[in-house]
């Protein structure tokens, strides 16, 4: 076995060297872009932290020790051996796409190539410059100060938005995003909390990654700027953490969301091509609403992937609650609910695959599903299926409609992994604590 381990180590090392050789020019180009695309604008004149010399606490100096570690992982983890993981991989295709790279901070935009599901084509600000947020204030929603998050998100050009340091941003009014933007909180601790939160309205190509959003409040009846050339009157906002309204190609990944006035993530009014992944959601009532109303038929075109999320303590219902449309709910970990986990009305197609459902102790709340405001003669025709889900503590999923795979083609966006590995796939859900110069 030692001979095998050394061979495995040598092969892994060779592959890594080849990958570094192939990508060295790309890495150099993006590093130059990161450090040189600063202008006189105070928001972009600050380079990102760069600490290539940081000691990697996971490094091992002794090659024999490395071989022994690899050998142990191969022998002790049946699932990892079967799926062919490397030592830093988890089987989560999003995380494995970028988190093994200790130089992630030098090539942040590669994250845009890692999306899966219906929102996989969301590129955010990949093709634009970096914008470094230096100022957590939000004193003027009409004339935002350069260097603030509000000033960044309203720009007409693509931008990859990062943060100079840890900060808590308390928004006075909705943060109305313009198209082709990425909010990237990796490497620092960023929270949007205690005020208004994020609105994605009639735009496209948005990535929100690595931030904390909590304690959002209702705001409005005020003027708010949405682009450099336009501002207007906003009525009262519901107080969602993230509100998606008439928008497409949206990716919400690795955020920690909790305790807001209305929903944590709502997608309505014809929104589609959305992936909600790797988020950690806690302490909230109505978690996710997908679809505006039973009568709003434009939502029949909605396609949403909900994958690798952890629905945690203090959640009550709507994980999600769907209307019309097509919803792929795959490899999520449901550890808490009070009323139900997945609900819907108006004939949505729900494809539940490879999830883990841990029912609450209440004997009257064991059912995963809820048909809202519908009688059985109506909902028995709706296509809701459970395939490969793991039901714990008496949890059960009430299926309906067709069983044929073809009926779920428009609600299928990626291959589901076994529910037995969900704990590993979702272990790092929520905003990550990434350190510059180390694997995240």
From Swiss-Prot:
Its EC number is 4.2.2.2. Pathway: Glycan metabolism; pectin degradation; 2-dehydro-3-deoxy-D-gluconate from pectin: step 2/5. Binds 1 Ca(2+) ion. Required for its activity. The keyword Calcium applies. Residues 1-28 form the signal peptide. PANTHER family: PECTATE LYASE 10-RELATED (PTHR31683:SF112), PECTATE LYASE 18-RELATED (PTHR31683). This is Probable pectate lyase 10.
């Amino acid at each position: 076995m030692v001979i095998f381990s050394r061979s495995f180590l040598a092969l892994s090392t060779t592959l890594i060297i080849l990958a570094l050789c192939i990508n060295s020019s790309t890495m150099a180009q993006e590093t130059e872009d990161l450090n040189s695309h600063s202008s006189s604008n105070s928001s972009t004149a600050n380079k990102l932290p760069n600490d290539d010399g940081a000691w990697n606490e996971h490094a091992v100096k002794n090659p024999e020790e490395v071989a022994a570690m690899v050998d142990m992982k191969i022998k002790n983890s049946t699932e990892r051996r079967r799926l062919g993981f490397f030592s830093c991989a988890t089987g989560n295709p999003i995380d494995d796409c970028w988190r093994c790279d200790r130089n992630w901070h030098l090539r942040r935009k590669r994250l845009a190539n890692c999306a899966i599901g219906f929102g996989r084509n969301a590129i955010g600000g990949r093709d634009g410059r970096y914008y470094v947020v230096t100022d957590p204030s939000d004193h003027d929603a009409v004339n935002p100060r350069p260097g603030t998050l509000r000033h960044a998100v309203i720009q007409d050009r693509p931008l990859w938005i990062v943060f100079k340091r840890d900060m808590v941003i308390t928004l006075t009014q909705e943060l109305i995003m313009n198209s082709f933007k990425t909010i990237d909180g990796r490497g620092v601790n960023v929270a949007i909390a205690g005020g208004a939160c994020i609105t994605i309205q009639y735009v496209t190509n948005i990535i929100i990654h690595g931030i904390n959003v909590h304690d959002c409040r209702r705001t409005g009846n005020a003027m708010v700027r949405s682009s450099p050339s336009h501002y207007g009157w906003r009525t009262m906002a519901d107080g969602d953490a993230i509100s998606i309204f008439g928008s497409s190609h949206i990716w919400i990944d690795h955020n920690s969301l909790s305790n807001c006035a209305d929903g944590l993530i709502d997608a309505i009014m014809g929104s589609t091509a959305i992936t909600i992944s790797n988020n950690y959601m806690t302490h909230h009532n109505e978690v996710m609403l997908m679809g505006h109303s039973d009568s709003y038929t434009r939502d029949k075109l909605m396609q949403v992937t909900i994958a690798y999320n952890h629905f945690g303590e203090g959640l009550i219902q709507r994980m999600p609650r769907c209307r019309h449309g097509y919803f792929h709910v795959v490899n999520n970990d449901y550890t808490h609910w009070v009323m139900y986990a997945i609900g819907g009305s108006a004939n949505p197609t729900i494809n539940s695959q490879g999830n883990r459902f841990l029912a609450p102790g209440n004997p009257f709340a064991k059912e995963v599903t809820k048909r809202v405001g519908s009688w059985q003669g109506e909902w028995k025709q709706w296509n809701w299926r459970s395939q490969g889900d793991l039901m714990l503590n008496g949890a059960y999923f009430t299926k309906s409609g067709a069983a044929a795979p073809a009926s779920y083609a428009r609600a299928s966006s990626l291959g589901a992994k076994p529910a037995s590995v969900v704990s590993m796939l979702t272990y790092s859900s929520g905003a990550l604590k990434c350190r510059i110069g180390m694997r995240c």
